[in-house]
């Protein structure tokens, strides 16, 4: 099947150098907004155009705590093992990031621990793995705007088996710090309970060849869902983080990540449009220039 045939949000590519195979993960439930979560599917391709699948990468057991909103799986290889970071929620539970594990890239994945890795009593989503220059793993995640109104991004250092946090979460930035981010329409402006809200979605870390540490993340801009970039002034995950003034993708697309093709081309993938059921994976060539990434001319 072609890329245009696959309904997917939050696409994530694991490029397997040995197999020369691209594995695509993402939010694959037909209606990811309500109803019981079905799981996550995986697709594989040699050329990012024709895909085999779906391959069931994760299906929940009856005992799994997450019941709805199966969102944004990412797959990372760390310490010889494959790990999936994904978002779930359930009635009387907070939205959270759960880490899962498998012996191979396409699964099937099972929960690494009984409970999620993000803080108790926080509405969290879109956890990603960052390994710093000392080899220490960090969870970078969003503290969701639905709880705190001005969505934020945090980093939390993990144990090397990824089973627990070893330090408190560190605040990195609020959504409203980026000049391109606009206030959302929720709650409705002018309504009885109106207050300003700002979204943070989909953080992803990328280190340039010159050592600069960048973060992709998504929010609402002038033309709807959009994706921006910020830069760590220290080169470390704890920043401070400088928001670049303009989004890298400004209209009806976001929740992206960066990978390198087997031919050496740097690629940005994200979903667009942002409406269900029309969302599809988009692949755009990018380049490093002047301490940032930009769309390739």
Predicted region positions:
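Carbohydrate-active catalytic/glycan-binding domains of CAZyme proteins
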Residues: 1-297
């Amino acid at each position: 099947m072609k890329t245009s045939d696959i309904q997917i949000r939050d696409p994530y590519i694991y490029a397997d150098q040995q197999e020369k195979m691209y594995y695509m993960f993402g939010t694959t439930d037909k209606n990811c907004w309500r109803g019981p979560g079905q799981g996550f599917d995986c697709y594989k391709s040699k050329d990012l155009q024709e895909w085999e699948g779906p391959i069931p990468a994760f299906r929940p057991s009856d005992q799994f705590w997450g019941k709805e909103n199966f969102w944004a799986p990412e797959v990372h290889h760390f310490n010889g093992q494959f790990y999936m970071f994904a978002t779930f929620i359930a009635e009387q539970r907070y939205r959270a990031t759960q880490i899962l594990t498998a012996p191979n890239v396409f699964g099937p994945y099972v929960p690494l621990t009984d409970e999620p890795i993000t803080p108790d009593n926080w509405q969290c989503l879109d956890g990603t793995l960052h390994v710093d220059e000392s080899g220490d793993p960090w969870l970078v995640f969003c503290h969701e705007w639905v709880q705190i109104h001005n969505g934020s991004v945090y980093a939390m250092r993990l144990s090397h088996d990824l089973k627990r946090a070893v330090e408190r979460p560190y605040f990195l930035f609020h959504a409203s710090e980026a000049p391109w981010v606009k206030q959302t329409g929720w709650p409705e402006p002018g309504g009885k309970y109106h207050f300003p809200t700002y979204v943070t979605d989909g953080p992803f870390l990328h280190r340039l060849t010159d050592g600069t540490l960048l973060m992709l993340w998504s929010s609402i801009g002038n033309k709807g869902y959009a994706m921006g970039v910020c830069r760590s002034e220290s080169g470390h995950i704890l920043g401070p983080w400088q928001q670049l003034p303009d989004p890298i993708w400004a209209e009806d697309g976001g929740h992206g990540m960066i990978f390198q093709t087997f031919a050496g081309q740097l690629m940005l993938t994200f979903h667009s449009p942002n409406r269900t059921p029309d969302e599809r994976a988009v692949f755009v060539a990018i380049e490093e220039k002047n301490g940032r990434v930009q769309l390739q001319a």
